Amino acid sequence: SAASDVYKRQALTRSDFSLAQSVVADDVLLDAAQRELEERAILTIAKRQPMAQDLREIVGSIRIASDLERIGDLGKNIAKRVMAVHEFGQPVQLTRGIEHMAELALDQLKDVLDSYATRDTDRAEAVRARDEDIDAMYTSIFRELLTYMMEDPRNISACTHLLFSAKNIERIGDHATNIAETIYYIKTGQQIEDERPKGDRTTSMVLPVNAATDK
């Protein structure tokens, strides 16, 4: 899928400027596809007045398309930050964790899209459970980058972009989890009852002043 292709690209860890530009350009395709799907879904509801399973399929497809479109937006934001970080350069050790986190998010996204294709609720629930791993990794990366900024204020600008890139990857995992929950709803007609785990522990941590605002 176009969304999956966006996250196969490791523009951040490779500091690949041209690849980052390509990711930004590809977001337009995702936006257009999402709009087209939504228009078709609304037209189908108006003309055929589907019920039960058929209606859930249509409503679910709208939800999933919205999550994929948002994932595209997050990918575009990461790509723009690659362009900014490219000017500063970044230590390899800081990007390895982010690269691994991105691989986890990509695997999560691939698995949830596969489970949508097969309507496999067990696989969708497994994807949902794995979101904790991405949350835990994000918290670890946050601490590492925060320490790096405190040790040398000259690192603040580059590390801020890396921080927000990591947060965007964590949010991609959240959207994959949303898709998993939608798949469960499509197949069963019920919402998953247990509360989603919340693994982000960074809200109690304090950023350096210059790094506190997203751009």
What positions do the PLM features span?
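Divalent-cation-assisted or electrostatically stabilized phosphate/pyrophosphate-binding catalytic cores
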Residues: 49-50, 55-59, 89-110, 117, ...
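Heptad-repeat coiled-coil/leucine-zipper interface motif in alpha-helices
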Residues: 15, 26, 33, 37-40, ...
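Short, small-residue-biased leader/transition segments that mark boundaries at the very start
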Residues: 2-7
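Leucine-rich amphipathic alpha-helices with coiled-coil/heptad-repeat character
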Residues: 37, 41-44, 48, 82, ...
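Amphipathic alpha-helix face/heptad-repeat signature
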Residues: 19, 23-26, 33, 57, ...
